[in-house]
Each structure stands twice: as C-alpha cells, then as structure tokens.
Curated annotation (Swiss-Prot):
Assembly with partners or alone: Homotetramer.
Gene Ontology cellular-component annotations: cytoplasm
EC number, UniProt record: 1.1.1.103
Superkingdom, taxonomy of origin: Bacteria
Name of the featured protein: L-threonine 3-dehydrogenase
Pfam families on file: ADH_N (PF08240), ADH_zinc_N (PF00107)
Functional summary from the UniProt entry: Catalyzes the NAD(+)-dependent oxidation of L-threonine to 2-amino-3-ketobutyrate.
HAMAP family, sorted: Thr_dehydrog
Cofactor: Zn(2+)
Cofactor detail note: Binds 2 Zn(2+) ions per subunit.
Length: 345
C-alpha cells in the first residue's frame, strides 16, 4: 500500500476544497484504518466549503474533511481485537474522551471533550480514514454501501425522532432536508398518528411526499392551522422535530404545539433569534436539544430500522464519482438535492 492517498482538503482559508495527495493516516495501537468506498456530503461540509464564520473559527487549515462514509478495514492497530482486515464498516464521527463524568456514566454522546472527524481531526474525504477501534461500526451484508454511508445523518434523524414516545402522537417536522425527511419516515414507522412536514422548498417537499410522508406543507403558501383542520386535528401537535434551523419555522412550531407538547431541536438557528417564551411556559412545553447520535444505541436502532424494511435510499438524489466532487457540492449548495454520495473506486 502506498503511503500517499488522494483526498479532498481544505488547504486554503477560502471558498472551496481541493483534491490533493496527502500522507495516509498513521495507525496507532488502538486505531483502525479504513479504505473508503463511499462518502456522503453533509451540511457541515458545505459550511466548510463556503468558509463561513463557523468554519473560519473551527476548521484548522489544512484539513482533510468529511465524516459520512462506508468502507472496509485496511489495517488494524497492534492492540485492536474486535475487527479484522477486509471487514465492511462505517464509523461514529464523534470521538469522545472516555474520562469525563458523562462518558464514564455511559453517556458518551454528551461528552464535553468531543472531537469531530473531518472537523477537528482528519476526515473521510480521502481514500483512507483512521478512527479509534471504539468508533468502528460493522455493517451487515444486507445493507448497501451507499445506505451505510449516510448512517451519520440518518442517526441524527433517529436520535431526534426517538427522543419522545411517538405511538399514536401527532408529529410536526419543520425542515424537509434529508434529515428532516428521514426523521418523518422514522416517526411514521414508529407509530405516529399524523406526521406533517413543512418547508418552503418545493423540491424538498416533493421528495418528502415521494418517500411516503402524506402531509407536506409549503409554509410560504399554506397556513399550517388550515392544514391541521383539514386532516382532522382538533388539538395541537404532541411532538415537534425542529430540523430547519429557521426561526420562523421554530416559532410556528411553538404556536402549533398542544399543551404539554415535546420538541426535539436538531436545527441550528441563527444567533439572537427570538421565540415567545410565554408560550413555552404556559403551554408547559418540553424542549430538548439534540446533537449527533447516542453511542451506540442509535446505531443499533438505525440498523434495525433498515433491516426491518425502512428504505432510506431514495433520500440519495445524486451519485457521483469522487473526481466530480464539485458537481456534488454545487448540488448541495443549491438546496435542491437530497443526499449526495461520492464513489471512491
């Protein structure tokens, strides 16, 4: 194996990514080196491409980015015991310290020292990625590479959707991006009574409808209260999944929740936006922030959903070779795509 590899690198502090040859990551005693088969583009990667304010203060330059992937093990460290070369795997992109109070209590997803693959350390937009043995997740043979490559965002959807009991509940999802759509699919699969998804992008709403979400609402043209009445809802929503990061959508969600409603918040809203806290108080709403996946219960549930027949592959709208990465990023930046999966070989 050569000691150099192709990779997409944030090599300059400006808009874009560049295909370069960089050293293959070194494998420590507890590490696993994975040959990447497929990578998917995340919204985080778009922020890094755009070199926005968050990226400028977060991403060291140069950096191999990316964190959504599927591949096969190419090399294992001297202390690795669970895995073998050739095994097909994905991996958890949040690397936790294992020493803080939350980690020691089995709540690794709450680790205050979390490092992100492709954010704080080299990522998966390369021919190889290296992660700790504890972050490796084996992929069953009946799950395709491209589906395993989007398990990171699917995990965000599963974690958010399953934050509260959904059986018989009326669920509002704000934001019909890939994670919002998958969250709505999980809610429907998990026994929700009514699942309504809102957005202002007709292409995303069309994709949501194609994937089986019965009630899609263009918030720029339709009144959500009228839609609720038309589908037989006489009270507010029991559960809200805020996936958009859009302040108007969040405010509308709070307004349409039933008393005692529960909201899981994954979307990252702009700084300084306002909500009516009086409604939160007097409706006695329960708000819960969501970040990443519960390790590794969410992964177990994802695999169970897919093996049980939940088909999330139509969320993938673009499949491209890695040399066409610019096309993939333009699709993501347009806001009119679902997931974009890039093939490394």
């Amino acid at each position: 194996m050569s000691n150099m590899m192709k990779a997409l690198v944030k090599s300059k502090p400006e808009v874009g990514l560049w295909m370069e040859h960089v050293p293959v990551p070194e494998v420590g005693p507890n590490d696993v080196l994975i040959r990447v088969r497929k990578s998917a583009i995340c919204g985080t990667d778009v922020h890094i491409w755009n070199w926005d304010q968050w990226a400028q203060k977060t991403i060291p330059v140069p950096m191999v980015v990316g964190h959504e992937f599927c591949g096969e093990i190419a090399e294992i460290g001297s202390a690795v015991t669970k895995y073998h070369v050739g095994e097909r795997v994905s991996g958890e992109g949040h690397i936790v310290c294992g020493k803080c109070r939350n980690c020691r209590a089995g709540r690794g997803h709450l680790c205050r020292n979390t490092l992100g693959v492709g954010v704080n350390r080299p990522g998966s937009f390369g021919e190889f990625v290296c992660i700790p043995e504890s972050n490796v997740v084996p992929i069953p043979d009946d799950i395709p590479d491209e589906v395993a490559a989007i398990f990171d965002p699917f995990g965000n959807a599963v974690h958010t959707a399953l934050s509260f009991d959904l059986v018989g509940e009326d669920v509002l999802v704000t934001g019909a991006g890939p994670i919002g759509i998958m969250g709505a699919m999980v809610a429907k699969r998990s026994g929700a009574r009514k699942v309504v998804i809102t957005d202002i992008n007709p292409n995303r709403l069309a994709l949501a409808h194609k994937l089986g979400i019965d009630h899609v609402v263009d918030a720029s043209k339709e009144n959500l209260a009228d839609v609720m009445k038309s589908i037989g809802m006489t009270e507010g929503f029991d559960v809200g999944l805020e996936m958009s990061g859009a302040a108007p959508a969040f405010r509308d969600m709070i307004d349409k929740m039933n008393n005692g409603g529960k909201i899981a918040i994954l979307g990252i809203a702009p700084a300084g936006f306002e909500i009516d806290w009086n409604k939160v108080i007097f409706k006695m709403l329960n708000l819960k922030g969501i970040y990443g996946r519960e390790m590794f219960e969410t992964w177990y549930k994802m695999i169970a959903f897919v093996q049980g027949g939940l088909d999330v592959s139509p969320v993938i709208t673009h499949r491209i070779g890695i040399d066409d990465f610019r096309e993939g990023f333009e699709a993501m930046r347009s806001g009119n795509s679902g997931k974009v999966v890039m093939d490394w070989f």
